[in-house]
Amino acid sequence: MNVQACSRCGYGVYPAEKISCIDQTWHKACFHCEVCKMMLSVNNFVSHQKKPYCHAHNPKNNTFTSVYHTPLNLTLKKSVAAMGGIDGKEDGEPFKSVLHWDMKSKAGAGAASRLMNERDYWPGYAEGNTWCPGALPDPEIVRMVEARQSLGEGYTEDREQQQGKGSFPAMITPAYQRAKAANQLASQVQYKRGHDERVSTFTPVADTPELLRAKAGGQLQNDVRYTEDGGQQRGKGSFPAMITPAYQIAKRATELASDVRYHQQYHREMKGMASPVGAEGGMTKDSVDRCGQVYSEECDEPRGKGSFPAMITPAYQNAKKANELVSDIKYRQDFHKMKGAAHFHSLAAQDNLVLKRAQSVSKLVSEVEYKKGLENSKGHSINYCETPQFRNVSKISKFTSDNKYKENYQTQLRGHYDGVGMDRRMLHALKVGSLASNVAYKADYKHDVVDYNYLATATPFYQTTMRLVPLKDVNYRQNIDRMKFSSVTNTPQIVQAKINAQQLSHVNYRADYERNKLNYTLPQDAPQLLKAKANAELFSEVKYKEGWQKTKGKGFEMKLDAMSLLAAKASGELASSVKYKEEYEKMKGRALGATDSKLLHSLQVAKMSSEVEYKKGFEESKTHFNLPMDMVNLRHAKKAQALASDLDYRKKLHDYTVLPEDMKTQWAKKAYGLQSELQYKADLAWMRGVGWLTEGSLNLEQAKKAGQLISEKNYRQRVDELKFTSVADSSQMEHAKKSQGLQNAVAYKAGNEQSVHQYTISKDEPLFLRARANAAQLSETLYKSSWEKQKAKGFELRLDSLAFLTAKAKRDLASEVKYKEDYERSRGKLIGAKSAQGDSQMSHSLQMSKLQSDLEYKKGFEDTRSQCHISLDMVHLVHARQAQHLATDVGYRTASHCFTALPTDMKVEWAKKAYGLQSDNQYRADMKWMKGTGWVATGSLHVEQAKKAGELISEKKYRQHPDALKFTSIKDTPEMVQARISYTQAVDRLYREQGENVKHHYTQTADLPEVLLAKLNAMNISETRYKESWSRLRDGGYKLRLDALPFQAAKASSEVISDYKYKEAFERMKGQMLGSRSLEDDLSLAHSVHATSLQSDVNYKKGFEHAKAHFHLPLDMVTLVHAKKAQTLASDQDYRHPLPQHTVLAEDLRLSCAKKAHKLQSENLYRSDLNFMRGVPCVVPGTLEIEGRKKASELISESKYRQHPGSFKYTAVTDTPNLLHAKYSNQITNERLYKAAGEDARHQYTMTLGLPEFIRAKTNAANLSEAKYKEAWHNLRAQGYKLTIDALPFQAARASGDIASDFLYRHEFVKERGQLIGVRNVSDDPRLLHCLRMGQLQSENQYRKEAASSQAQCHLPMDMMYLVHARKAQALASDHDYRTQCHEFTALPEDLKMAWAKKAHALQSEFRYKADLMGMKGTGWLALQSPQIESAKKAGDLISETKYRKKPDSIKFTTVVDSPDLIHAKESYMHCNERLYRLGDAASLHRYTPIPDHPDFTRARMNAMHLSDKVYRNAWEQSRAGGYDFRLDAIPFQTARVSRDIASDFRYKEAFLRDRGLQIGYRSISDDPRTTHFLRVGRLQSDNEYRKAFAKGRSQFHSRADQPGFLQAKRSQQLASDVLYRQPLPQHTSDPEQLGLKHARKAHQLQSDVKYKSDLNLTRGVGWTPPGSYKVEMARRAAELANRRGPGIRGASVEPEAAAALGDHQSRGVNPDASEILHIHKKKTLLM
């Protein structure tokens, strides 16, 4: 901002106080009259010589010489009359009672004025020092003491001398003395007369008070000493103004000048002591002379001193004020009325900044005053409108009006000069005359500039005081309970939640789809459509199976260096635990550029380890946790819970429209009848594996890794105790995923079925012909026959051939030394970023350094979070995008970028190769679909890279042995989340509540299929039929083998119950959730940052009132909607809510039930209504649900984990969910309440006897009959049964014993206290909402009061994305919908899927059902030997703690006969079998006669020579004997040196230190992040500065929606979730015939993952172009044509490279062998 200087004071002028007049810039306070100093405005000033004047003092009008009736002349006239003897005495007598003019005070004022004489002080001071060295005290103390004496006792002594003489002539009256002094002052001659004589009359006497005071005044007047003291005192400000010497002098001078005190002293000491003897006139004259001399010196001194006049010294100001304060009360009143004109220095205490500041400092020093004002001042900030400067200006502006000025002049001054000589108005006129002096004005003005003309907040002592405020004991030690909470609406979590809500909005998704779906027009004769039709024929499953059967059993030759054998070796190395961990150590540390979760975790753990900090911030921070409900692990936990829990197994099925004879209906009847534990478990056993988490699966490993990373024990223990953890996103796991996707027969056939019916192509289409040619090329029969032909022919292979060169290049790529050499060369190339924020690694290092400083972290969080802006086209971002495209399979088929380069350019070739090598995923994917096997060749680039990366990030090599890791339980693991969800689902109240809600929300017709189904179900539930069937089953008996499903299930459950296996799986699962790019992307880190900001006590209380009204939370956010929905499901509140108004028939069943529900107002009646349903959701011990809870209890059992619970005392927390559940259970099971409620309900309810509910109630009553129960119990007891120690009831009792342990409960409660934190407020946490709602529901009044108001406040659109997804997931994961009616599809009657559906509906018996399942085995079931299962097993073995630690001798060998490895080994053995090879070759020996000079035969001989081991050894011996030159600068030597330097830790640190300071060259400090960081750290070292700036900067957060953190979060969300998978592509304006548009149309069809992978499988052989294919022949033909047209020999020498470039350009993604063969053809052509 351009600030101009004021024309008067020279200081900067800000817009708020700016006036532009007379071509100059002024302050409002500086724009005043040059004569009277009255403040002017732009409308009432007069300009003269570019200076402002008022109208009264306009120099053009006021050029007068003399006026007779001036106040001075009138005063002289009155004075002459006053000296007239009797009249003077008569006038003097009444005056004595009005005002006693104190001559001693006048002399004192003159003495005070003489104190400012600089020349008199220093000689006396020096003489005093020499006269009494060391005896003089501090000059300040001497001055104060002597001033008191000279103005006190000295005055009374002189007064007593005068009074004791007895005479009181008129000449010594105050009126006479004043008139005489005024006459002398008015005379210029008298003024200057006697100056030299007076100078010589003053002979310093060392011990006179006047001399000492003059010395002190001279010292104060000294310009050098004054400025020194001012500089020393400028920044202190922390001591009150009352203890300064200037304040003491002013106070003393005020007391001396006080009219009241003067009268008191006069009546006490002087009255009655007057003497008639005349006073000495010389003394009066001498006093007058002294006053004149001092006045002249006072006037002359400032004129020669320039910009620092003596009038601004404190001594002069005090003396001046003492002289001006002689007036009485009325004068002061008038003075206060006129003070706005020029009296800046005499404001009231409320408006005087100095006094106000002094009072404020005194209050701040006082702890009592500070504590009293703390609550009033904590929410305020400095405002310019509240500063004394603004108030002064506003008050002064009242007096600057010309109208009011003239009004006061007319009423108070004009015409009032006549009167007594001592008239107060005349005194006021004299006062104004003295104020009109320019010198005096400027002295006051300079003083005012110091006090008023800059912001009060910028004063040094104000800054010092404000810095001391947070350090007060009150602020520092106050209780955390007094702090209030305020929510910030612009936090990254809320912003991210808004963005997620917009992205997850089904309306937005459908809107974009509706806009885009009509933008495509596809003509019928489009080449893509024709090609699709041709592909439809190629995709025929019949032809596919026919070709597969033909080629399946023919076998093929495999050499020892074949890719399959190399892949087997590589897989052997992959399976090696040692090599895997070695690669893991190498790979560790590559994930640079992301936020360091471990470092942030260490900071978080340090905070959490403080018990005080934990207790202080728990209540505030527990509501700030924001967890998006569509996270991968949560969805996985939900699905796993739905599969693993028994809750929904026997739940009453929802109402679906199915036929009564439907197989699913029969199955539901059977499921409801399964009450025997054996039958129940047998039924569960065949479903084993459906919802079970495979040990070692990707999700488990990720969760285990995340737990390990945030484990406090792992972090704090010694480095040599860390265990080994597996990385879930390693190359092996990714490879297993890709292999599973490629080999998935279901996806392959599903995609084939869809595309079979969608394409039509003409037979003579070129694309169709080419597809036929490709089909011929892809034929395995033709391939093997051509391969046999080529193998028999042989070919020429020279040492400089492409194959050898390629092998060497691959060897160099696989060489670790060369890899490191290339890495070291390329390490510093990515430079050129504009700032450190542009470089991800530098930004990461800077962020780490900031995070390590707790002060920096707290201080700069709110200010710096809006200062990150990264341009999207920076190098590392572009590189990250390209790497992302290369690493994912999404952009695999996108068209390459368009480059303008010559085809023969070597850079183009190298760039193509580099692009293929840079992407690890693309490289492997390319290898996989080219090879067709899914294996990675040993020694390839990505294998070596993976090994190297594993070695680099190996925890074992980097730090320690993994044996010593201990177990730490994490509350938010999938197991714990699953346990919580299981608990929620197992609550009996919620189950019944949901049933009641469902029961009252539909209207049914009597003949609906649902009603018929309900009748059938009622028959199935019949107690009589149940007992009959049970008796028949029981009498028939059954056979139970050792391999029966119940036994197998028991074995599996025993493994599940194993605590050791759980902890082993937990250790593997910890730490997977890593890799967030910034703090905002990581929930834990964002929560830690937010929690730390909340831990600031002062900061929290300071901004609460100001920020609590800024909270805005859209009600349609995903988390809120989900929380509302979850609350309605989880709470009991809506159970008795009045139902929303629906239009129903009067006889509707639901209306009757609703009436009954509204009558249930008594709690007893309410519970009695629940009691009739007792036993319906009864859980049988030993079920999956109970076992899961047992397992959860054992997992969190502290006694098993750490210590015995007997040493802990019991303290119950009454409001926990468990206790609340126990209370409710106790109330529900209360027999007295049950019967009382039953009596009440019996007289208030009438029900139809034929209702299914009534029949079910009768059935339940029969089931709950005590007599029948005891009878059945006695029958069972008489039969007896076998109960072993390891039986499930015993296991359940043990688990329940652990659950009932109060110590475990207390311990888990304490451990869990700080875990559930991070939601932004209570409304975001469903559990907290549930607890609050439970508290409200316990009050019957609260319940009835809130019932009507809250019933209509929940709106949840049923088509929201996550709800739809949850429904689909539920339908897929549960057995619930298995028998539901299939959705309606439009399919042909002869469609294969239609026939299959009919067949599935016909399966009604369990035998046929399971037999049909056996027929479908492999379709939706994971095969035991599938790559996914095998990779999971292998991963489990690799990270198995048991297998890792035990000796190899103890490992038993079990081989799987049909494993891929053995099958592959068998086939390899058959291929490598010499007998079989020769046997097959013998038949062809007699059928072929080669020409001896045939080129192929000749080439075979040459190849035999090349491949001969004997010839090879002879050549080696010859070359070795010949020797060769190997210099010191050879590449191997250089490579060895570089690799040694790379491996040297010292060299690494040395390079790091050299590299640290190279980022120089910034234009300014603001461009250098480190310098800016240091400056900011310097400011932030002051805690006061941080807290003061916090409130100002808290609302300045601005986060761009397109910043990389948000974009990365969006992309990560898109990759991790299935929500946006099918989102339509953005609209582009492109040619309809453009290849990209055609590809986009094709991509829009690939909406499911199955179709996508099936499409990949369909095209597995398309991109692989074997020799002699259409592309190769076309390239060869083009090369030959170009060769013919080439210019002679030169063209021939250039053409091979061009042809190679052309071929490579046309066949990017083609098998490199085709390119090599093409080059061989070209070389042979050239040689010929």
Swiss-Prot record:
One of its GO terms (biological process) is actin cytoskeleton organization. One of its GO terms (molecular function) is metal ion binding. It comes from the Eukaryota. It holds the Pfam family Nebulin. The modification Phosphothreonine is found at T203. SUPFAM superfamilies: Glucocorticoid receptor-like (DNA-binding domain). PROSITE patterns: LIM_DOMAIN_1, LIM_DOMAIN_2, NEBULIN. GO terms for cellular component: fascia adherens; muscle tendon junction; myofibril; Z disc. Expressed in cardiac and skeletal muscle. Not detected in kidney, spleen, liver, brain, lung, stomach or uterus. Nebulin repeats lie at residues 173-200, 201-235, 244-271, 313-340, 345-379, 386-414, 416-450, 484-518, 519-553, 555-589, 599-623, 624-658, 659-689, 699-721, 723-757, 758-792, 794-828, 841-866, 867-893, 898-932, 943-960, 966-1000, 1001-1035, 1037-1071, 1075-1109, 1110-1136, 1141-1175, 1180-1203, 1209-1243, 1244-1278, 1280-1314, 1318-1352, 1353-1379, 1384-1418, 1425-1446, 1452-1478, 1487-1521, 1523-1557, 1561-1595, 1596-1630, 1637-1661. Keywords: Actin-binding, LIM domain, Metal-binding, Phosphoprotein, Repeat, Zinc. Interacts with actin, alpha-actinin, KLHL41, TLN1 and VCL. Interacts with CSRP3. SMART domains: LIM, NEBU. May be involved in anchoring the terminal actin filaments in the myofibril to the membrane and in transmitting tension from the myofibrils to the extracellular matrix. This is Nebulin-related-anchoring protein. The gene is Nrap. Residues 4-64 form the LIM zinc-binding domain. The modification Phosphoserine is found at S1078.
